[in-house]
Amino acid sequence: MNTPLKSALCLLLAGAAFGTPSGLNNIPTADTVPHRTVAVQYFSSFGGANQFGTGEPGKSGHWMGFKSGWDFEPIHLEWGMDSPLGTGVSGPLFFQTKARFSPWEDGMFAIGIAGIALTDIDRAGDPFSYAMLAHDFGFARLHAGYGYQTNGSSYLFGVDRTWKLFGRNFNLNTDLAQTRDQRGLITAVGAKYDLTKHIVLETWANFPDRDAVSLIAKINFVFTF
C-alpha cells in the first residue's frame, strides 16, 4: 500500500537522510564526509510509514549505500549512491551530491541535490534540491534551510550537540521537516555513536503528524584511502 504520507516522505526526504553521518535524521545538513573518506551504510526501518519503507506500513524496509568526500579548498564536496534492497522489487539506485564552504568562523553553508534516479526513473520521483546553513554556538549547532521538489518542498530545521562518551563521540539531535507539500510536519529525535574508529551507529524515531511512529537503525562502516 502506497499511503499519502509514505509517498510524501519518499519524495521529500529522498536525499535528506540517505545515509551518512554528514546529515541529521530527516534533513540534510551543511556537513560533508571528510576528505578521501568513504562511509558504507546499511539501514532498516520499522513501524509506521517512513522515507525508507519499501513495503506496507508496519513492515521493515532495507537500504544500502555509500558516500565519500573530497576537499578542494575552500570547497568541500560530497557524493554518494544508495538503493532499497529486497527479495521483491529493489531499486531505484539514487545519486546525491553537495558542496560546502565556511562563510564565517563556526558557520557552514551547503547546496546539494539528492534523489537523482540512475535506474527505474519512471517510479523514482523527482530530485530534491536544497540549501542548508549551520552555525556552532558552542552549546549546540543549529541548522536551517530549504528544500525544493515538485509537490514536496520543505523548510528544514535541526539542532544537535556532541559529547564524549567513553572517549568517543556521542551525538543527540532533533529535526523538523514538512510533508504533504508543506501541509504536514514530521519531527525526529535521534542519536549517533562512534563505536570504533571505523563504525558509527545511528538510530532515530520519526513522529509524523499523521500515521504511526517509525524507527530507523543504521550502521556506517567508515574508512579512508
What is each stretch, according to the model?
Residues M1-L24, F225:
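Cleavable N-terminal export/targeting peptides
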Residues G19-S129, D136-G138, T162-N171, D175-T179, ...:
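Transmembrane beta-barrel domains of Gram-negative outer membranes and organellar outer membranes
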Residues A124, F128-T150, S154:
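Membrane-proximal helix-loop-helix units in multi-pass membrane proteins
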Residues L156-D160:
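Alpha-helical transmembrane segments in multipass membrane proteins, preferentially the mid-helix core
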